Amino acid sequence: MSRSTPTTLGALKASGYRSRPVKDELRENLIGRLESGDKLFPGIRGYEDSVVPQLVNAILARHDFILLGLRGQAKSRILRQLTGLLDARMPVIAGSEVNDDPLAPISKYGRQAIAEHGDDTPIEWLAREQRYLEKLATPDVTIADIIGDLDPIKAARGGYILSDELTIHYGMLPRANRGIFAMNELPDLSPRIQVGMFNILEEGDVQIKGYPIRLRLDLLIAFTANPEDYTARGKIITPLKDRIAAEVRTHYPKDVETGMAITEQEAWLVRNGRPLQIPTFVREVVERMAFLARMESRVDQRSGVSQRMPIAVLETLVSSAEQRAIRQDEGDVVPRIGDIYASLPAVTGKMELEYEGELHGAGRIARELVSAAAGMTYDDYAGGADVDAIVEYFDNGGVMQVSEDAAASACVTGFGQVPGLLELADLLGLAPEDASDGLRAAACELILEGLVSDQKISRTRGGGYRRAGV
Protein backbone atom coordinates (compact mmCIF):
# COMPACT_ATOMS: atom_id res chain seq x y z
CA MET A 1 0.00 0.00 0.00
CA SER A 2 1.43 3.38 -0.97
CA ARG A 3 1.94 6.22 1.51
CA SER A 4 -0.78 8.25 -0.21
CA THR A 5 -3.42 5.58 0.38
CA PRO A 6 -5.95 6.91 2.92
CA THR A 7 -6.07 4.96 6.18
CA THR A 8 -8.69 7.05 7.99
CA LEU A 9 -12.13 8.35 7.11
CA GLY A 10 -10.90 11.92 7.10
CA ALA A 11 -8.09 11.15 4.68
CA LEU A 12 -10.53 9.25 2.46
CA LYS A 13 -12.85 12.26 2.29
CA ALA A 14 -9.93 14.56 1.54
CA SER A 15 -8.83 12.30 -1.33
CA GLY A 16 -12.11 12.94 -3.14
CA TYR A 17 -13.09 9.25 -3.09
CA ARG A 18 -16.57 8.63 -4.46
CA SER A 19 -18.43 5.46 -3.56
CA ARG A 20 -20.79 3.91 -6.10
CA PRO A 21 -23.08 0.86 -6.24
CA VAL A 22 -21.28 -2.31 -7.28
CA LYS A 23 -23.45 -2.73 -10.39
CA ASP A 24 -22.54 0.80 -11.49
CA GLU A 25 -18.89 0.00 -10.80
CA LEU A 26 -19.08 -3.13 -12.96
CA ARG A 27 -20.94 -1.26 -15.67
CA GLU A 28 -18.50 1.66 -15.81
CA ASN A 29 -15.43 -0.57 -15.79
CA LEU A 30 -16.99 -2.76 -18.50
CA ILE A 31 -17.58 0.30 -20.65
CA GLY A 32 -13.91 1.19 -20.19
CA ARG A 33 -12.89 -2.29 -21.34
CA LEU A 34 -15.15 -2.06 -24.38
CA GLU A 35 -13.76 1.34 -25.31
CA SER A 36 -10.16 0.16 -24.98
CA GLY A 37 -10.79 -3.09 -26.85
CA ASP A 38 -9.37 -5.20 -24.02
CA LYS A 39 -10.43 -8.84 -23.82
CA LEU A 40 -13.35 -9.15 -21.42
CA PHE A 41 -12.89 -12.75 -20.32
CA PRO A 42 -9.30 -13.93 -20.92
CA GLY A 43 -8.98 -17.65 -21.51
CA ILE A 44 -12.66 -18.11 -22.37
CA ARG A 45 -12.84 -19.37 -25.96
CA GLY A 46 -15.74 -19.98 -28.31
CA TYR A 47 -18.16 -17.60 -26.60
CA GLU A 48 -17.20 -14.41 -28.43
CA ASP A 49 -20.37 -14.32 -30.54
CA SER A 50 -22.79 -16.02 -28.17
CA VAL A 51 -22.32 -15.95 -24.40
CA VAL A 52 -20.11 -12.86 -24.02
CA PRO A 53 -22.49 -10.41 -25.78
CA GLN A 54 -25.36 -11.61 -23.58
CA LEU A 55 -23.25 -11.19 -20.45
CA VAL A 56 -22.24 -7.71 -21.54
CA ASN A 57 -25.90 -6.79 -22.00
CA ALA A 58 -26.77 -8.10 -18.53
CA ILE A 59 -23.97 -6.15 -16.84
CA LEU A 60 -24.72 -2.96 -18.76
CA ALA A 61 -28.37 -3.33 -17.72
CA ARG A 62 -27.30 -3.82 -14.06
CA HIS A 63 -29.03 -7.21 -14.00
CA ASP A 64 -28.57 -10.20 -11.75
CA PHE A 65 -28.27 -13.25 -14.02
CA ILE A 66 -28.00 -17.02 -14.25
CA LEU A 67 -25.68 -19.09 -16.45
CA LEU A 68 -27.48 -22.17 -17.77
CA GLY A 69 -25.26 -24.91 -19.10
CA LEU A 70 -24.02 -28.47 -18.81
CA ARG A 71 -20.90 -29.44 -16.90
CA GLY A 72 -17.54 -28.35 -18.19
CA GLN A 73 -18.76 -25.19 -19.98
CA ALA A 74 -16.68 -22.65 -18.00
CA LYS A 75 -19.61 -21.30 -15.97
CA SER A 76 -17.69 -20.98 -12.71
CA ARG A 77 -14.66 -19.56 -14.49
CA ILE A 78 -16.77 -16.85 -16.08
CA LEU A 79 -18.24 -15.88 -12.73
CA ARG A 80 -14.82 -15.70 -11.10
CA GLN A 81 -13.54 -13.50 -13.89
CA LEU A 82 -16.22 -10.93 -13.11
CA THR A 83 -13.86 -9.68 -10.40
CA GLY A 84 -11.74 -8.25 -13.21
CA LEU A 85 -14.48 -5.68 -13.75
CA LEU A 86 -14.29 -4.49 -10.13
CA ASP A 87 -12.01 -1.69 -8.97
CA ALA A 88 -8.55 -2.89 -7.93
CA ARG A 89 -9.21 -1.92 -4.29
CA MET A 90 -12.16 -0.73 -2.23
CA PRO A 91 -12.19 1.03 1.17
CA VAL A 92 -14.17 -0.45 4.08
CA ILE A 93 -14.45 0.40 7.75
CA ALA A 94 -11.76 -1.64 9.50
CA GLY A 95 -13.19 -4.67 11.26
CA SER A 96 -16.58 -4.56 9.55
CA GLU A 97 -18.03 -7.99 8.74
CA VAL A 98 -20.25 -6.60 6.00
CA ASN A 99 -17.72 -4.42 4.18
CA ASP A 100 -19.29 -1.18 5.42
CA ASP A 101 -18.84 1.78 3.10
CA PRO A 102 -16.99 4.41 5.18
CA LEU A 103 -19.22 7.07 3.62
CA ALA A 104 -22.51 5.17 4.13
CA PRO A 105 -22.29 2.31 6.67
CA ILE A 106 -25.23 -0.12 6.88
CA SER A 107 -24.35 -2.00 10.08
CA LYS A 108 -24.55 -0.88 13.68
CA TYR A 109 -20.85 -1.66 14.04
CA GLY A 110 -19.99 0.73 11.21
CA ARG A 111 -22.24 3.50 12.47
CA GLN A 112 -20.85 3.20 16.00
CA ALA A 113 -17.26 3.27 14.71
CA ILE A 114 -17.88 6.56 12.92
CA ALA A 115 -19.82 8.02 15.86
CA GLU A 116 -16.95 7.15 18.20
CA HIS A 117 -13.94 8.03 16.05
CA GLY A 118 -15.28 10.50 13.50
CA ASP A 119 -12.73 11.34 10.81
CA ASP A 120 -10.19 9.18 12.66
CA THR A 121 -12.21 6.04 11.93
CA PRO A 122 -9.69 3.51 10.58
CA ILE A 123 -10.33 2.08 7.15
CA GLU A 124 -8.79 -0.82 5.26
CA TRP A 125 -8.72 -1.72 1.60
CA LEU A 126 -10.09 -4.89 0.03
CA ALA A 127 -8.59 -6.32 -3.15
CA ARG A 128 -11.07 -7.12 -5.91
CA GLU A 129 -10.59 -10.87 -5.33
CA GLN A 130 -11.78 -10.48 -1.73
CA ARG A 131 -15.09 -9.09 -2.94
CA TYR A 132 -16.20 -12.34 -4.58
CA LEU A 133 -17.96 -15.05 -2.57
CA GLU A 134 -19.15 -18.34 -4.03
CA LYS A 135 -21.45 -20.98 -2.58
CA LEU A 136 -22.43 -24.41 -3.88
CA ALA A 137 -26.15 -24.91 -3.36
CA THR A 138 -26.87 -28.16 -1.53
CA PRO A 139 -30.05 -29.38 0.19
CA ASP A 140 -28.47 -28.88 3.63
CA VAL A 141 -27.79 -25.15 3.14
CA THR A 142 -29.65 -23.12 5.77
CA ILE A 143 -30.96 -19.58 6.07
CA ALA A 144 -28.23 -18.99 8.65
CA ASP A 145 -25.58 -19.95 6.06
CA ILE A 146 -26.92 -17.55 3.46
CA ILE A 147 -28.39 -14.65 5.42
CA GLY A 148 -27.45 -14.99 9.08
CA ASP A 149 -28.76 -15.78 12.55
CA LEU A 150 -28.52 -14.79 16.20
CA ASP A 151 -25.28 -15.71 17.93
CA PRO A 152 -25.85 -16.30 21.66
CA ILE A 153 -22.12 -16.83 22.23
CA LYS A 154 -21.32 -13.44 20.71
CA ALA A 155 -24.02 -11.90 22.91
CA ALA A 156 -22.59 -13.51 26.04
CA ARG A 157 -19.01 -12.52 25.29
CA GLY A 158 -19.92 -8.94 24.43
CA GLY A 159 -22.44 -8.49 27.21
CA TYR A 160 -25.23 -7.70 24.75
CA ILE A 161 -28.90 -8.61 24.94
CA LEU A 162 -30.09 -10.89 22.15
CA SER A 163 -32.10 -8.09 20.56
CA ASP A 164 -28.91 -6.09 19.96
CA GLU A 165 -27.85 -5.95 16.32
CA LEU A 166 -24.25 -6.58 17.36
CA THR A 167 -25.15 -10.19 18.24
CA ILE A 168 -25.84 -11.08 14.60
CA HIS A 169 -23.71 -13.73 12.96
CA TYR A 170 -23.85 -12.70 9.32
CA GLY A 171 -24.28 -15.21 6.52
CA MET A 172 -22.58 -15.19 3.14
CA LEU A 173 -24.87 -12.64 1.48
CA PRO A 174 -24.18 -9.84 3.98
CA ARG A 175 -20.48 -10.72 3.99
CA ALA A 176 -20.46 -10.29 0.20
CA ASN A 177 -21.85 -6.75 0.53
CA ARG A 178 -20.40 -4.34 -2.06
CA GLY A 179 -19.22 -7.27 -4.12
CA ILE A 180 -20.32 -10.31 -6.12
CA PHE A 181 -22.17 -13.31 -4.70
CA ALA A 182 -22.31 -16.44 -6.86
CA MET A 183 -24.39 -19.54 -6.18
CA ASN A 184 -23.68 -22.69 -8.17
CA GLU A 185 -26.34 -25.31 -8.97
CA LEU A 186 -29.27 -23.17 -7.83
CA PRO A 187 -31.94 -25.91 -8.34
CA ASP A 188 -30.36 -27.92 -5.50
CA LEU A 189 -31.27 -25.17 -3.03
CA SER A 190 -34.29 -26.14 -0.93
CA PRO A 191 -37.51 -24.18 -1.64
CA ARG A 192 -37.59 -22.47 1.76
CA ILE A 193 -34.09 -21.10 1.18
CA GLN A 194 -35.14 -19.95 -2.28
CA VAL A 195 -37.91 -17.97 -0.60
CA GLY A 196 -35.27 -16.32 1.56
CA MET A 197 -33.61 -14.97 -1.59
CA PHE A 198 -36.68 -12.97 -2.67
CA ASN A 199 -35.96 -9.71 -0.90
CA ILE A 200 -32.32 -9.43 -1.86
CA LEU A 201 -33.10 -9.96 -5.56
CA GLU A 202 -35.96 -7.47 -5.73
CA GLU A 203 -35.55 -4.94 -2.92
CA GLY A 204 -31.84 -5.42 -2.30
CA ASP A 205 -32.15 -6.08 1.42
CA VAL A 206 -32.26 -8.96 3.88
CA GLN A 207 -33.97 -9.44 7.22
CA ILE A 208 -32.09 -11.23 9.97
CA LYS A 209 -34.07 -13.71 12.04
CA GLY A 210 -35.73 -12.04 15.00
CA TYR A 211 -34.74 -8.52 14.00
CA PRO A 212 -36.86 -5.69 12.62
CA ILE A 213 -33.63 -4.36 11.10
CA ARG A 214 -33.15 -4.58 7.34
CA LEU A 215 -29.68 -4.54 5.84
CA ARG A 216 -29.63 -2.70 2.55
CA LEU A 217 -27.05 -4.76 0.70
CA ASP A 218 -25.25 -3.74 -2.46
CA LEU A 219 -24.61 -6.86 -4.56
CA LEU A 220 -24.41 -8.41 -7.97
CA ILE A 221 -25.89 -11.89 -7.64
CA ALA A 222 -25.12 -14.55 -10.24
CA PHE A 223 -26.25 -18.16 -10.38
CA THR A 224 -25.43 -21.30 -12.37
CA ALA A 225 -27.67 -24.26 -13.14
CA ASN A 226 -28.15 -27.25 -15.40
CA PRO A 227 -30.79 -26.26 -18.00
CA GLU A 228 -32.93 -29.35 -17.42
CA ASP A 229 -32.97 -28.88 -13.64
CA TYR A 230 -33.70 -25.18 -14.00
CA THR A 231 -36.66 -25.68 -16.33
CA ALA A 232 -38.08 -28.73 -14.51
CA ARG A 233 -41.33 -27.81 -12.81
CA GLY A 234 -40.92 -27.53 -9.06
CA LYS A 235 -37.13 -27.30 -8.95
CA ILE A 236 -37.10 -23.50 -8.91
CA ILE A 237 -40.03 -21.67 -7.37
CA THR A 238 -41.59 -19.32 -9.89
CA PRO A 239 -41.24 -16.04 -7.94
CA LEU A 240 -37.48 -16.60 -7.61
CA LYS A 241 -37.10 -17.37 -11.30
CA ASP A 242 -39.08 -14.23 -12.07
CA ARG A 243 -36.64 -12.13 -10.05
CA ILE A 244 -33.57 -13.31 -11.98
CA ALA A 245 -33.35 -10.70 -14.71
CA ALA A 246 -31.28 -12.51 -17.35
CA GLU A 247 -30.70 -16.08 -18.51
CA VAL A 248 -27.46 -16.74 -20.39
CA ARG A 249 -26.99 -20.18 -21.95
CA THR A 250 -23.50 -21.59 -22.30
CA HIS A 251 -22.51 -24.33 -24.74
CA TYR A 252 -19.72 -26.70 -25.72
CA PRO A 253 -17.26 -25.72 -28.49
CA LYS A 254 -19.04 -25.53 -31.81
CA ASP A 255 -16.10 -26.71 -33.92
CA VAL A 256 -13.10 -28.98 -33.47
CA GLU A 257 -10.59 -26.15 -33.86
CA THR A 258 -12.07 -24.21 -30.93
CA GLY A 259 -12.19 -27.36 -28.83
CA MET A 260 -8.55 -28.10 -29.59
CA ALA A 261 -7.55 -24.58 -28.59
CA ILE A 262 -9.39 -24.92 -25.26
CA THR A 263 -7.92 -28.35 -24.58
CA GLU A 264 -4.38 -27.23 -25.36
CA GLN A 265 -4.82 -24.15 -23.18
CA GLU A 266 -6.07 -26.12 -20.18
CA ALA A 267 -4.05 -29.34 -20.38
CA TRP A 268 -0.83 -29.74 -18.42
CA LEU A 269 1.66 -30.32 -21.21
CA VAL A 270 4.74 -28.29 -20.28
CA ARG A 271 6.64 -30.82 -18.20
CA ASN A 272 10.18 -30.96 -16.93
CA GLY A 273 11.28 -33.86 -19.07
CA ARG A 274 11.95 -34.86 -22.64
CA PRO A 275 10.84 -32.59 -25.51
CA LEU A 276 7.17 -33.13 -26.39
CA GLN A 277 5.80 -33.30 -29.93
CA ILE A 278 2.07 -33.96 -30.20
CA PRO A 279 1.03 -34.51 -33.83
CA THR A 280 -1.85 -32.29 -34.88
CA PHE A 281 -3.84 -35.29 -36.05
CA VAL A 282 -3.56 -36.88 -32.59
CA ARG A 283 -5.01 -33.72 -31.06
CA GLU A 284 -7.82 -33.85 -33.61
CA VAL A 285 -8.67 -37.43 -32.71
CA VAL A 286 -8.83 -36.54 -29.02
CA GLU A 287 -11.16 -33.60 -29.65
CA ARG A 288 -13.39 -35.48 -32.05
CA MET A 289 -13.93 -38.11 -29.37
CA ALA A 290 -15.65 -35.47 -27.23
CA PHE A 291 -17.73 -34.22 -30.16
CA LEU A 292 -18.85 -37.76 -31.00
CA ALA A 293 -19.63 -38.52 -27.36
CA ARG A 294 -21.91 -35.46 -27.28
CA MET A 295 -23.89 -36.99 -30.16
CA GLU A 296 -23.79 -40.61 -28.95
CA SER A 297 -27.28 -41.94 -28.19
CA ARG A 298 -25.95 -44.30 -25.51
CA VAL A 299 -24.54 -41.35 -23.55
CA ASP A 300 -26.92 -39.26 -21.42
CA GLN A 301 -26.92 -35.92 -23.23
CA ARG A 302 -28.85 -34.27 -20.39
CA SER A 303 -25.72 -34.67 -18.31
CA GLY A 304 -23.38 -33.66 -21.10
CA VAL A 305 -19.78 -34.60 -21.85
CA SER A 306 -17.51 -32.13 -20.16
CA GLN A 307 -14.64 -30.36 -21.91
CA ARG A 308 -12.60 -31.86 -19.08
CA MET A 309 -12.74 -35.18 -20.94
CA PRO A 310 -10.46 -34.26 -23.88
CA ILE A 311 -8.25 -32.32 -21.46
CA ALA A 312 -7.80 -35.39 -19.27
CA VAL A 313 -7.30 -37.65 -22.30
CA LEU A 314 -4.61 -35.38 -23.75
CA GLU A 315 -2.76 -35.27 -20.43
CA THR A 316 -3.01 -39.05 -20.03
CA LEU A 317 -1.85 -39.89 -23.54
CA VAL A 318 1.15 -37.60 -23.06
CA SER A 319 1.93 -39.52 -19.87
CA SER A 320 1.62 -42.81 -21.76
CA ALA A 321 4.03 -41.58 -24.44
CA GLU A 322 6.30 -40.14 -21.76
CA GLN A 323 6.45 -43.48 -19.99
CA ARG A 324 7.35 -45.23 -23.25
CA ALA A 325 10.05 -42.67 -24.06
CA ILE A 326 11.62 -43.17 -20.64
CA ARG A 327 11.53 -46.97 -20.86
CA GLN A 328 12.89 -47.02 -24.42
CA ASP A 329 15.35 -44.17 -23.80
CA GLU A 330 13.92 -42.14 -26.67
CA GLY A 331 14.87 -38.49 -27.10
CA ASP A 332 11.39 -37.09 -27.84
CA VAL A 333 7.93 -37.81 -26.46
CA VAL A 334 5.59 -38.38 -29.41
CA PRO A 335 2.07 -39.68 -28.63
CA ARG A 336 0.45 -42.17 -31.00
CA ILE A 337 -3.09 -43.46 -31.48
CA GLY A 338 -2.29 -46.39 -29.20
CA ASP A 339 -1.69 -43.91 -26.41
CA ILE A 340 -5.28 -42.72 -26.80
CA TYR A 341 -6.48 -46.27 -26.20
CA ALA A 342 -4.23 -46.30 -23.13
CA SER A 343 -6.08 -43.19 -21.95
CA LEU A 344 -9.52 -44.78 -21.79
CA PRO A 345 -9.66 -44.48 -17.96
CA ALA A 346 -9.83 -40.72 -18.54
CA VAL A 347 -12.91 -41.24 -20.73
CA THR A 348 -15.10 -43.80 -19.00
CA GLY A 349 -15.63 -41.82 -15.81
CA LYS A 350 -16.75 -38.71 -17.67
CA MET A 351 -19.76 -40.20 -19.45
CA GLU A 352 -23.16 -40.79 -17.88
CA LEU A 353 -24.71 -43.67 -19.81
CA GLU A 354 -28.27 -44.37 -20.83
CA TYR A 355 -29.72 -47.84 -20.25
CA GLU A 356 -28.43 -49.16 -23.58
CA GLY A 357 -25.03 -47.73 -22.82
CA GLU A 358 -24.94 -49.49 -19.47
CA LEU A 359 -25.61 -52.77 -21.29
CA HIS A 360 -22.67 -52.20 -23.64
CA GLY A 361 -20.35 -50.82 -20.98
CA ALA A 362 -18.38 -47.58 -20.84
CA GLY A 363 -15.16 -49.27 -21.95
CA ARG A 364 -16.63 -50.56 -25.19
CA ILE A 365 -18.25 -47.22 -25.99
CA ALA A 366 -14.99 -45.39 -25.30
CA ARG A 367 -13.06 -47.69 -27.66
CA GLU A 368 -15.67 -47.16 -30.35
CA LEU A 369 -15.35 -43.40 -29.90
CA VAL A 370 -11.58 -43.59 -30.40
CA SER A 371 -11.99 -45.69 -33.54
CA ALA A 372 -14.68 -43.44 -35.00
CA ALA A 373 -12.73 -40.26 -34.20
CA ALA A 374 -9.58 -41.69 -35.77
CA GLY A 375 -11.60 -42.66 -38.83
CA MET A 376 -12.99 -39.16 -39.26
CA THR A 377 -9.56 -37.62 -38.85
CA TYR A 378 -8.05 -40.06 -41.35
CA ASP A 379 -10.80 -39.27 -43.86
CA ASP A 380 -10.00 -35.56 -43.57
CA TYR A 381 -6.39 -36.21 -44.54
CA ALA A 382 -6.79 -39.16 -46.93
CA GLY A 383 -9.33 -37.72 -49.37
CA GLY A 384 -9.84 -41.01 -51.24
CA ALA A 385 -6.17 -41.98 -51.33
CA ASP A 386 -5.23 -45.32 -52.89
CA VAL A 387 -4.87 -47.85 -50.07
CA ASP A 388 -5.32 -51.02 -52.12
CA ALA A 389 -1.74 -52.22 -51.58
CA ILE A 390 -2.03 -51.81 -47.81
CA VAL A 391 -5.37 -53.60 -47.62
CA GLU A 392 -4.11 -56.37 -49.91
CA TYR A 393 -1.19 -56.99 -47.54
CA PHE A 394 -3.58 -57.77 -44.71
CA ASP A 395 -6.03 -59.66 -46.93
CA ASN A 396 -3.17 -61.98 -47.87
CA GLY A 397 -2.61 -62.88 -44.23
CA GLY A 398 -0.29 -60.09 -43.16
CA VAL A 399 -0.45 -59.16 -39.49
CA MET A 400 0.92 -56.11 -37.70
CA GLN A 401 1.24 -56.00 -33.91
CA VAL A 402 1.76 -52.54 -32.39
CA SER A 403 2.12 -52.47 -28.62
CA GLU A 404 1.82 -49.29 -26.59
CA ASP A 405 5.36 -49.61 -25.24
CA ALA A 406 7.07 -50.43 -28.56
CA ALA A 407 9.88 -48.07 -29.52
CA ALA A 408 9.14 -45.74 -32.43
CA SER A 409 12.08 -47.07 -34.43
CA ALA A 410 10.82 -50.63 -34.09
CA CYS A 411 7.34 -49.54 -35.19
CA VAL A 412 8.70 -47.77 -38.27
CA THR A 413 10.67 -50.89 -39.18
CA GLY A 414 7.51 -52.96 -38.86
CA PHE A 415 5.39 -50.50 -40.81
CA GLY A 416 8.00 -50.61 -43.56
CA GLN A 417 6.94 -54.20 -44.23
CA VAL A 418 3.46 -53.04 -45.24
CA PRO A 419 3.62 -51.97 -48.89
CA GLY A 420 2.91 -48.27 -49.37
CA LEU A 421 2.16 -47.45 -45.72
CA LEU A 422 5.10 -45.15 -44.98
CA GLU A 423 4.82 -43.66 -48.45
CA LEU A 424 1.13 -42.86 -47.87
CA ALA A 425 1.97 -41.11 -44.59
CA ASP A 426 4.37 -38.92 -46.56
CA LEU A 427 1.91 -38.36 -49.43
CA LEU A 428 -0.89 -37.26 -47.09
CA GLY A 429 1.38 -34.79 -45.32
CA LEU A 430 1.11 -36.64 -42.02
CA ALA A 431 4.79 -37.47 -41.72
CA PRO A 432 7.44 -36.65 -44.35
CA GLU A 433 10.10 -39.22 -45.12
CA ASP A 434 12.66 -37.23 -43.13
CA ALA A 435 10.39 -36.84 -40.08
CA SER A 436 11.25 -38.40 -36.72
CA ASP A 437 10.46 -42.06 -36.14
CA GLY A 438 7.92 -41.01 -33.52
CA LEU A 439 5.93 -38.90 -35.96
CA ARG A 440 6.12 -41.51 -38.73
CA ALA A 441 4.93 -44.23 -36.36
CA ALA A 442 2.03 -42.05 -35.17
CA ALA A 443 1.02 -41.29 -38.77
CA CYS A 444 1.04 -44.95 -39.75
CA GLU A 445 -1.12 -45.83 -36.75
CA LEU A 446 -3.64 -43.19 -37.81
CA ILE A 447 -3.82 -44.66 -41.32
CA LEU A 448 -4.35 -48.16 -39.96
CA GLU A 449 -7.03 -46.90 -37.55
CA GLY A 450 -8.72 -45.17 -40.47
CA LEU A 451 -8.79 -48.43 -42.40
CA VAL A 452 -10.23 -50.16 -39.33
CA SER A 453 -12.96 -47.53 -39.14
CA ASP A 454 -13.69 -48.06 -42.85
CA GLN A 455 -13.87 -51.82 -42.10
CA LYS A 456 -11.12 -52.60 -44.60
CA ILE A 457 -8.98 -54.22 -41.90
CA SER A 458 -9.62 -55.12 -38.26
CA ARG A 459 -7.97 -54.34 -34.93
CA THR A 460 -7.67 -56.53 -31.85
CA ARG A 461 -7.96 -55.27 -28.28
CA GLY A 462 -4.21 -55.79 -27.93
CA GLY A 463 -3.27 -53.48 -30.81
CA GLY A 464 -2.96 -56.08 -33.57
CA TYR A 465 -4.00 -55.26 -37.15
CA ARG A 466 -5.17 -57.97 -39.55
CA ARG A 467 -7.58 -58.58 -42.41
CA ALA A 468 -11.19 -57.53 -41.97
CA GLY A 469 -13.61 -60.00 -40.44
CA VAL A 470 -11.04 -61.76 -38.28
PLM features: what roles do these ranges have?
Residues N272-F281, L292-A366:
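C-terminal helical "lid" subdomain and adjoining coupling/linker elements of P-loop NTPases
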Residues T263, V286-A290:
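Short alpha-helical scaffolding segments that buttress acidic/His motifs in well-ordered protein cores
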Residues S2-E257, W268-E284, L292, S297-R302, ...:
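Conserved ASCE/P-loop NTPase catalytic core
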